[in-house]
Regions:
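Conserved acetyl-CoA-binding loop-helix of GNAT-fold acetyltransferases
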Residues: 83-96, 108
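A short beta-loop-alpha structural element at the N-terminal edge
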Residues: 3-17
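Helix-loop element at the rim of GNAT/NAT acetyltransferase active sites that forms part
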Residues: 8, 19-32
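Glycine-rich acetyl-CoA-binding "A-motif" of GNAT/NAT acetyltransferases
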Residues: 52-58
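Conserved active-site alpha-helix within GNAT-family acetyltransferase domains
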Residues: 104, 110-136
């Protein structure tokens, strides 16, 4: 990740995070996020910026669901920056943060299960996840016919 800076998101990053996530939401690859949601959950977000241009090139969030459960969500990397380790850096940092917080399990809903298997996530039935996690699904254009794959990582 040469020339890339990974850090916690700042209030000035919200609109850029919003634009990046919704770029992929328009392609039905991520759930859309409103500005209000991103402001409400700003502390969940990690970002990667290009050092020279300060361009936001990637983001990912660790959403806390319960005392022992968190979600890796809203992973997005600009296409021209993919396959450079940026997404991996973001996911690893979310995993590290979960460990620091004492969280025992992290899940994700994804279209790229092979990618998350690299970090130790394994496929599970969606029915194994608590009902609380499905609140966001109402915003999905594919609801109620979810085609994402549920995965979990035990820490």
């Amino acid at each position: 990740m040469k020339g890339i800076h990974l850090k916690k998101a700042h209030i000035t990053d919200v609109r850029k995070i919003h634009n990046l996530i919704n770029l992929y939401a328009q392609k039905n690859l991520l759930l859309p996020r409103s500005l209000s949601e991103i402001y409400d959950h700003l502390r969940d977000f990690w970002i990667c910026k290009e050092k020279e241009t300060d361009e936001l090139v990637g983001t990912c969030a660790l959403g806390i669901c319960w005392e022992d459960l968190a979600e890796v969500r809203s992973l997005a990397v600009l296409e021209r920056y993919q396959r450079k380790g940026i997404g991996a850096g973001l996911v690893k940092r979310c995993i590290e943060e979960a460990e620091e917080l004492g969280i025992k399990r992290i899940f994700t809903l994804t279209y790229i299960p092979d990618y998350f298997e690299r970090f130790g996530f394994r496929r599970i039935s969606k029915s194994m996840l608590p009902h609380k996690v499905w609140a966001d699904c109402i915003k999905c254009s594919k609801f109620p016919d979810c085609d994402e794959i549920a995965m979990i990582l035990k820490l």
